[in-house]
Amino acid sequence: MELLRSARPHPKEKLKNVIEWFHWLLREAELYDVRYPVKGAYVWRPYGMKLRRNVEELIRRVHDETGHEEVLFPVFIPYEFFGKESQHIRGFEKEVFWVSKGGEGGERLVLRPTSETAIMPMVKLWIQDYKDLPLRLYQIVSVFRAETKMTHPMIRLREISMFKEAHTVHVDREDAERQVREAVEIYKRIFDEMCLAYMINKRPDWDKFAGAEYTIAFDTVLPDGRTLQIGTAHYLGTNFTRVFEVTYLDADGTRKLAHTTSYGISERSIAAMLITHGDDGGTTLPPKLAPIQIAVVPIYYSDEEMPLVMKFVEEVVAALKGAGLRLHVDDRRDKTPGWKFYYWELKGVPLRLEVGKRDVEKRQVVVTRRDTLEKYAVALGELVDAVRELMKAVEDNLRRRAWEELRSKIVKVQSLEEAKKAIKEGKVVEVPWSGDNQCGMKIQELLGADALGIPMDSEASIGGYDARDLACGERRAELWLRLSERY
């Protein structure tokens, strides 16, 4: 493999306006159509749907490998179920879509915003004793939220159409909290394969999931410095099992309340992946998830050259398909090679192969990496190994760049002025906090930012020195509190 052109990646000037760039990408790369005439509801186009299916397969694989079983619950939740858990209904009531009429009448129903209150009544019927636990279920479904804020494609929706929600049931708090820790590891595996960088934060009490004892969240930082929540895991304690009377017979012969968890991710993770790996030319898809891993572009300038080039392309395709690689031959005669290069770069295809008359004579192809635009000459006999090596290099580079960018955005500050300046510059700040909720909410107000919570991926404790709460100076700070502007 011979390097023909060193790295010269596209700039990222357009990503200074993330939402405008994202709309452009979704439209031009034929991923998603935002023109459907219902606010917050959008259309997945065929290329986008193939990408989504690959992400769903990743999610299913990781959950199946960790003892979860897939289920499918109805979209309708009876109001008598939804209204049972008081914290839950207070948290979701303003976002709920109600089915107020069906035919000549009927019961009052809710379009699920999430499924805790749908699943618990059924779980109650399935669990008899401790031998039935733990129970780990998941589904990938649509959920509905009556968003009143501005909606954005994949990011803030009224129909979240790729909502993976897992629900687990356990004998006690210890086992349920162990499951929350496993959920964190599950999400690490998924996001690592998507080449995403992330912070792990314990949400403050005022921002935890409605009905949870606590919430652990994954947040990523987009190029404009605003954060995007891409996953959450909740320890629900006995809050739902108590009101739905989900009990089990323990080994000692007594009936006990089960403990539950839930954890979810959605198409927000795909949005984060597209944006994180984006540039002025489009995006770069991680090779394992790309619908098309290799775009093959035959180059010929006469009818005489065409059969020679296309015959060699057949050899190239046979070698790559035989290795199980996903590829597409762009043999459109009404488009120039340069136009095709732009098109496949826009769509994020990790590698492009060019085959011209001179390449046929040398029995080689020219391979271009989408992430760096480096070019290599590769002999046909070495092609499969070279492609695998280059795809691994693309994946590693995407992941490395994402983590470097995220780490550069997180700063510790000691004063209100420093914090305001850093947030204005698109940073995530860590500030001293006493742990008092009123003080935490006051910090949010003073900074005009959102509290992400206590860091779970770095040292959360202030340590031995005498730091003061950023908002309540009379209180000694015990913890770091992360804040940012967020979507």
Swiss-Prot record:
InterPro entries for the chain: aa-tRNA-synt_IIb (IPR002314), aa-tRNA-synth_II (IPR006195), aa-tRNA-synth_II/BPL/LPL (IPR045864), Anticodon-bd (IPR004154), Anticodon-bd_dom_sf (IPR036621), Pro-tRNA-ligase_IIa (IPR002316), Pro-tRNA-ligase_IIa_arc-type (IPR004499), Pro-tRNA_ligase_II_C (IPR016061)
Catalytic activity field: tRNA(Pro) + L-proline + ATP = L-prolyl-tRNA(Pro) + AMP + diphosphate
PROSITE patterns according to UniProt: AA_TRNA_LIGASE_II
Keywords: Aminoacyl-tRNA synthetase, ATP-binding, Cytoplasm, Ligase, Nucleotide-binding, Protein biosynthesis
This enzyme's EC code(s): 6.1.1.15
Primary subcellular site in the record, as a coarse category: cytoplasm
Annotated function: Catalyzes the attachment of proline to tRNA(Pro) in a two-step reaction: proline is first activated by ATP to form Pro-AMP and then transferred to the acceptor end of tRNA(Pro).
Protein name per Swiss-Prot or TrEMBL: Proline--tRNA ligase
Lineage: Archaea, Thermoproteota, Thermoprotei, Thermoproteales, Thermoproteaceae
Gene name tied to this protein: proS
